[in-house]
Amino acid sequence: MNDRAAAFADSRQQHNRQDSAGMQEYVLQARGITKAFVQGGFNVQVLNNTELTVRRGEKLAVVGASGSGKSTLLHVLGGLDEPSAGEVSLLGKPFTQLAERERNELRNRALGFVYQFHHLLPEFTALDNVAMPLRIRRMTTEDAREQAQAMLERVGLGPRAKHRPGELSGGERQRVAIARALVTKPACVLADEPTGNLDGTTADTVFNLMLELSETLETSFVIVTHDPDLAARCDRIMRLRDGVLHEEPALPV
């Protein structure tokens, strides 16, 4: 009886360890997310009790019609907008329930953002744009620039570090934006149409870079895109329709 009890206890401990490991694999989780706005006196529901999970190193594409709420979803996932109901967890912490200061600290530590338009500071060099998130963390200028230079090398722009955004091509500016998003080594990057403002060849190059960095840095990506070919190259595709995310079947690349 004692042997059986010991075996049972050992089995339960192993099961609990597996559950704990499984929880740690999820860098981002959303449960029951609802978001509504009041427009013209009418209540407009954009997200309706939707769910999402993102594993470490996973590349998730979010597709859907224009105006379906994809950008709103990213804002809620990133803690930039409050959901009307539901909860977002980031690295196992209840992101949406944290005080503003704690939420900002966790966002700066664990999330990166890339947008359709690069939003680089025009008066700063590529190097100082990439170093900015590290300076916000109160890292010394020397250390921040050293890490920023290393990340610019990773995206193939080491020789362009001293150039300002106006001296770079569209694809180069977007690569600087990706370097800025990744320089803090975030667990997850939220990307809103990151190639939407680029021509086809440049978009493909930038997307390849994102996929490569996701693999080498074990960084998760949630990528909103209208391009079905790019979406098909992600690990999973979810379609936002009527405020709810639906898993799409895997497509051949």
UniProtKB/Swiss-Prot annotation:
Q: Where, in this chain's numbering, is ATP bound?
A: G64, A65, S66, G67, S68, G69, K70, S71
Which Gene Ontology terms of cellular component type are present? Answer: plasma membrane
- EC number per UniProt: 7.6.2.-
What molecular functions are annotated in GO for this chain? ATP binding; ATP hydrolysis activity; transmembrane transporter activity
Assigned keywords, A-Z: ATP-binding, Cell inner membrane, Cell membrane, Membrane, Nucleotide-binding, Translocase, Transport
Q: Where in the cell is it found?
A: Cell inner membrane
Q: Which Pfam families match?
A: ABC_tran
Q: Where does the record place the region Disordered?
A: 1-20
- What PROSITE patterns has UniProt attached to this entry? ABC_TRANSPORTER_1 (PS00211), ABC_TRANSPORTER_2 (PS50893), LOLD (PS51244)
Q: What family does this belong to? A: Belongs to the ABC transporter superfamily. Lipoprotein translocase (TC 3.A.1.125) family.
Q: Which NCBIfam families match?
A: LolD_lipo_ex
Which function does this protein serve?
Answer: Part of the ABC transporter complex LolCDE involved in the translocation of mature outer membrane-directed lipoproteins, from the inner membrane to the periplasmic chaperone, LolA. Responsible for the formation of the LolA-lipoprotein complex in an ATP-dependent manner.
What is the protein's name according to its record?
Lipoprotein-releasing system ATP-binding protein LolD
Which species expresses this protein natively?
Burkholderia orbicola (strain AU 1054)
The coding gene here is lolD
